[in-house]
Amino acid sequence: MKEIMAVMLSLLACTVLLAGCNNFSESNEEQSLKVYSFSGENEYISVSNGVIILDGKEEICYGGDLKVMSDNFSDITTYSTTIYINGSEKETLLSNSVDDQTGETIDVSGNIGKISGDVLRDSDDKLTDNLWFELKTTNLSGEENTYRVQLKTTEITKEVKK
């Protein structure tokens, strides 16, 4: 019984010591966490549930969901989606392409995709009025079309203490 108590006290002491090994300087610093949601639509397409997360260390862009609202997309064989900032020059945040090589058609609606890393090269100030979505399609006849939607961006969170 004494051995069990000695082991329990040793484990408790180790736990207390290790709990103090947290990065103390970072716990007192203010960390910037910003979360933006975005969506937009026109008569042809709708983008919803998009999210951009910036925490000072990592940047993540979830493209959201694409929905077609027209019959123009029933014979698509190739398409690409791009989310970009339209400033002095076009800054691409996320881009995906799908190409069917079998001669069949592709459903354009669905998840746009996700990317993490250095998503925003400069600051996030440009997100509010300059975020755009672009869909380029090619149909069975080889006809190419481009659809653009300006995305309404809303900042959900601001500065938080960690």
Regions from the PLM with identified roles:
Residues 143-162:
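Short beta-strand elements
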Residues 65-69, 82-84, 118, 134-138, ...:
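Residue-level recognition of well-ordered beta-strand positions that form the cores
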Residues 22-24:
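Bacterial signal peptide processing site
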Residues 35-88:
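Short, surface-exposed binding/anchoring microloops in extracellular/periplasmic proteins
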Residues 52, 97-101, 151-157:
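A short, sequence-level motif marking secondary-structure junctions
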Residues 90-145:
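Short, solvent-exposed, Trp/other aromatic-anchored flexible loops in extracytoplasmic proteins
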Residues 29-35:
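Immediate post-signal-peptide N-terminus of mature secreted/exported proteins
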Residues 1-19:
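Sec-dependent bacterial lipoprotein signal peptides
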